[in-house]
Amino acid sequence: MAVAVKKKKFTVDDYYLLAEAGIISYDDRVELIHGEIIEMSPHNPPHSVCINRLNMLFASQLAGKAIVSVQLSLTLDNYNEPEPDLVLYKHRDDFYKGEKSKPENALLVIEVANTTIKYDRGVKRELYAKAGIPEYWIVDVKNQLLERYTVPEKGQFEQKEILEKEDSVKLSQLNFTVELKKVFG
């Protein structure tokens, strides 16, 4: 008789208890995906440079209009807390003090992909669509392309657009246009 192997799924609360107990460290590069603790890829220079460019661009142009969050957790549901490379949140004067980040407050989620493109296109895209994130970007550092996903419906994004380094993309919710040559350098 075959016995099915069961995995223990961790909730977001379990995940934080593991950190408080010292089993995982707040400095560990991990995230909670489908109840599993997933080790993230190490930083590399092209990835870091692109994140820094995006951060500078958004922070300088969107002060008072949006909150720029760099590599901090985003609680999507009870079993998923990824750590996107960058999130733009609706502006609030209190910066959501005392609250976990929630998908309904996010305007844009960005993953910068240098070595994780398949994962970002698959698992992450599905998670963000199911959570109702209005706009998701995958910044493909290697090929200097931006994949833009919008209109989350029934667990998937209805619209996909591929943009090149010479293109611009408008964030309609913020009335702001990003020149991709500034992102890719």
Residue ranges and their predicted role:
Residues 1-185:
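Gly/Pro/Ser/Thr-rich low-complexity, intrinsically disordered segments predominantly at protein N-termini
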